[in-house]
């Protein structure tokens, strides 16, 4: 039986909140089978839980939020959610003493390291996957995203940014998903933004944690970070990272082929909701052994060590 995963032990880290610029303590806790992914704000009394759920997602100018029925929110969940998807973590409680997850370096890599440091444990309960049975597509003007049936998980993402720092050959990225591929090719890609936008937001008391330490910053002509880019095509790789996190908001790894053109958090979420709303378009599946499991989801030794 392919089993659900959680952490072996509690781990903690600190970072800066993108919105407030204040120190945030992040605690990751193991959770029993069928708990799912739970985000928890401990700065509120009593603490408030936000289960990962496609219908709770709100896209803001700066990040992805989860919002409950009382309009209480937790922000900047997307990069940690991508790390959970990358390592196939089914059950976890994520605590922060703030209204947001720390931005760290603007990628998912610090969260991957934290999860691997905690160790990954298998629970004696079958892991559920969402398998795509029918093609589902959503559009917004010239932007679109779709899922097609496929026995694995592939992603093909195209951006269309007209900027001297972004070469035309660096606007598309495609990959066969696996934990190894995610960690090596995607997890280190950072979020990006224009210096003028960051300065404008900070003048209004927003994005106070935004800096060269947590994003690729560009002006009209070039990348301003002293160290430059981590990959020639880091921009599109980060958009794929975002998509992996957005699509894991259902709390399950997805078996299917994802293709997108100029998509963002809102359209990725719209696609996920469109799939889940169409009963005949998907099904839950479990697997008895590795022989049945799509190659995309076979755990490398680095994960289940």
UniProtKB/Swiss-Prot annotation:
GO terms for biological process: lipid A biosynthetic process. Zn(2+) binds at residues 79, 238, 242. Pathway: Glycolipid biosynthesis; lipid IV(A) biosynthesis; lipid IV(A) from (3R)-3-hydroxytetradecanoyl-[acyl-carrier-protein] and UDP-N-acetyl-alpha-D-glucosamine: step 2/6. Its cofactor is Zn(2+). The keyword Ribonucleoprotein does not apply. GO terms for cellular component: membrane. Pfam families: LpxC. It catalyses: a UDP-3-O-[(3R)-3-hydroxyacyl]-N-acetyl-alpha-D-glucosamine + H2O = a UDP-3-O-[(3R)-3-hydroxyacyl]-alpha-D-glucosamine + acetate. GO terms for molecular function: metal ion binding; UDP-3-O-acyl-N-acetylglucosamine deacetylase activity. Keywords: Hydrolase, Lipid A biosynthesis, Lipid biosynthesis, Lipid metabolism, Metal-binding, Zinc. InterPro entries: Ribosomal_Su5_D2-typ_SF, UDP-acyl_GlcNac_deAcase, UDP-acyl_GlcNac_deAcase_C, UDP-acyl_N-AcGlcN_deAcase_N. Coiled coil: none annotated. The active site is at 265 (proton donor). Signal peptide: none annotated. Its EC number is 3.5.1.108. Belongs to the LpxC family. Catalyzes the hydrolysis of UDP-3-O-myristoyl-N-acetylglucosamine to form UDP-3-O-myristoylglucosamine and acetate, the committed step in lipid A biosynthesis. This is UDP-3-O-acyl-N-acetylglucosamine deacetylase.
């Amino acid at each position: 039986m392919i089993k659900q995963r959680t952490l072996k032990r509690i781990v903690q880290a600190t970072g800066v909140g993108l919105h407030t610029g204040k120190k945030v303590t992040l605690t990751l806790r193991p959770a029993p089978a069928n708990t799912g992914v739970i985000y928890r704000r401990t700065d509120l009394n009593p603490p408030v839980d936000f289960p990962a759920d496609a219908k709770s997602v709100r896209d803001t100018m700066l990040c992805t939020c989860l919002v409950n029925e009382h309009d209480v929110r937790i922000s900047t969940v997307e990069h940690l959610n991508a790390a959970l998807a990358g390592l196939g973590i089914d059950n976890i409680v994520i605590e922060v003493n703030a209204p947001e997850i720390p931005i760290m370096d603007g990628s998912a890599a610090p969260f991957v390291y934290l999860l691997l440091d905690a160790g990954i444990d298998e629970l004696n309960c079958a892991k559920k996957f969402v398998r795509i049975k029918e093609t589902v597509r959503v559009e917004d003007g010239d932007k679109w995203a779709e899922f097609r049936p496929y026995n694995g998980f592939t992603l093909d993402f195209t951006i269309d940014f007209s900027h001297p720092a972004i070469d035309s050959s660096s606007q598309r990225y495609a990959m066969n998903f696996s934990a190894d591929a995610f960690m090596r090719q995607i997890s280190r890609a950072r979020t990006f933004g224009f210096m003028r936008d960051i300065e404008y937001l900070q003048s209004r008391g927003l994005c106070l944690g935004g800096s060269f330490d947590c994003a690729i910053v560009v002006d009209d002509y070039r990348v301003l970070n002293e160290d430059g880019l981590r990959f020639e095509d880091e921009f599109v790789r980060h958009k794929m990272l975002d998509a992996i996190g957005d699509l894991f908001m259902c709390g399950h790894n997805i078996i299917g082929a994802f293709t997108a053109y100029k998509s963002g958090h809102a359209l990725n979420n719209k696609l996920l909701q469109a799939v889940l709303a169409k009963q005949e378009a998907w099904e839950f599946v479990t697997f008895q052994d590795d022989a049945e499991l799509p190659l995309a989801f076979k755990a490398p030794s680095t994960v289940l060590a």
